Amino acid sequence: MTTPLAGRPLLDAHVNSPDVLAGLQRAFNLYEDALVHNKVDVLDALFWDSVHTLRYGAKENLNGYSEIKAFRASRPSVGLSRDILDCHIVTFGSSAGVANITFRRAGEPRVGRQSQTWVKFDMDFADGWRVVSAHVSWMDL
């Protein structure tokens, strides 16, 4: 359902326009597949190539695309599978959105949390959607 923003919107007018939401969901699914199968080139392509891009992980704070890319290249390629417990994707206008999930990994008693801010750029791959900010953390139960 498309919901107009309350008050005076500072971006174009709708939350979760069906076509925009579908595009971000496709990009998110592409990201998730690349993550669990260690497709580093796809992960790199889905992050905004900018010094302004951030990724705060469970054990690291990465500032800028080059730090994120170096992290991806050096991380272990095993133990990446996870089960998504809950997923919330919301788009704002035609070029911004957020994706938030909770997940579990085999052998890990904690619940993982991931938040991503996505912006749509004038690019072909993944309909132009890029992660501009990400945060991963663990929650003790």
Please place each PLM-identified region on the residue numbering.
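Short, mixed charged/polar active-site loops
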Residues: 60-61, 109-113
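Surface-exposed, charged secondary-structure patches
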Residues: 66-111
